[in-house]
């Protein structure tokens, strides 16, 4: 059983997984990008992330 979880603490995203699949890597990249973008945006702005 693959276990993966994300912890968001102090604006730092850490992805831990037992299997580094391409999908996991893609989600990790998107999560890191979202955190980086949110740190640059003003309060009240909205980040929308869509996965197809």
Curated annotation (Swiss-Prot):
Subcellular location: Nucleus
Organism: Rattus norvegicus (Rat)
Protein name: Nuclear respiratory factor 1
GO molecular function term, any single one: DNA-binding transcription activator activity, RNA polymerase II-specific
GO cellular component: nucleus
Protein purpose: Transcription factor that activates the expression of the EIF2S1 (EIF2-alpha) gene. Links the transcriptional modulation of key metabolic genes to cellular growth and development. Implicated in the control of nuclear genes required for respiration, heme biosynthesis, and mitochondrial DNA transcription and replication.
Main location: nucleus
Superkingdom: Eukaryota
UniProt entry tagged with the keyword Electron transport: no
Alphabetically ordered keywords of this record: Activator, DNA-binding, Nucleus, Transcription, Transcription regulation
Post-translational modification summary for this protein: Phosphorylation enhances DNA binding.
Tissue specificity remark: Expressed at high levels in the lung and testis, at intermediate levels in the kidney, heart and brain and at low levels in the muscle and liver.
Subunit composition and interactions: Homodimer. Binds DNA as a dimer. Interacts with PPRC1.
One GO BP annotation of this record: response to lipopolysaccharide
Family stated for the protein in its record: Belongs to the NRF1/Ewg family.
